[in-house]
Amino acid sequence: MSKEKEVLLNEEIRADEIRCVGDDGKVYGIISSDEALEIANRLGLDLVMIAADAKPPVCKIMDYGKFRYQQEKKQKEAKKKQKVIDIKEIKLSVKIAQNDINYKVKHALEFLEQGKHVRFRVFLKGREMATPEAGVALLEKIWTMIENEANRDKEPNFEGRYVNMLVTPKKA
């Protein structure tokens, strides 16, 4: 289930010779895996393979349960620090009135002030599909109204029945 690679522990380590390091940083040098396992058992710890690719493989004597707990804790911290980008979508049509454009732009500016990304989508109906330039022209008109408050990620582009434009808030 977990995506992390399987770690070899104790008896699972099949190498004849390994480079062994203690939990406290003590270097045991290149010793047999049986000898390293004996040292780990004497200390009440686990023998964990850290670098299987190295010649000879590198193993560390440590408390594996504690090590795994710390790894999971680091992953949770990293996940908390990730920023989720919220994209708000504003749908338009080619035959939209100027007052409606002003209303939608006002909402877009509110979203941008909140730090959200805004995607403008112009839906092309029927014969409007033959001239997507009208949708691009509408998005350019909207861009002139918001360019002081936003950065344009992409030029207006045509996808299926839509002409899209993504804008992001300007950095303060």
UniProtKB/Swiss-Prot annotation:
Superkingdom of this entry's organism? Bacteria
A GO cellular component entry from the record: membrane
Keyword Cytoplasm recorded:
yes
Q: Which residues form a coiled coil?
A: none
Protein name (database record) = Translation initiation factor IF-3
Q: Which GO terms describe its biological process?
A: ribosome disassembly
Tell me which family the UniProt entry assigns to this protein. Answer: Belongs to the IF-3 family.
Q: Which keywords fit this entry according to its UniProt record?
A: Cytoplasm, Initiation factor, Protein biosynthesis
Q: What does this protein do?
A: IF-3 binds to the 30S ribosomal subunit and shifts the equilibrium between 70S ribosomes and their 50S and 30S subunits in favor of the free subunits, thus enhancing the availability of 30S subunits on which protein synthesis initiation begins.
Q: Where in the cell is it found?
A: Cytoplasm
Q: Which InterPro entries match?
A: T_IF-3_C_sf, T_IF-3_N_sf, Translation_initiation_fac3_CS, Translation_initiation_fac_3, Translation_initiation_fac_3_C, Translation_initiation_fac_3_N
Q: What is its main location?
A: cytoplasm
Subunit-structure text: Monomer.
Q: Which GO terms label this protein's molecular function in UniProt? A: ribosome binding; translation initiation factor activity
Species source reads Campylobacter jejuni (strain RM1221)
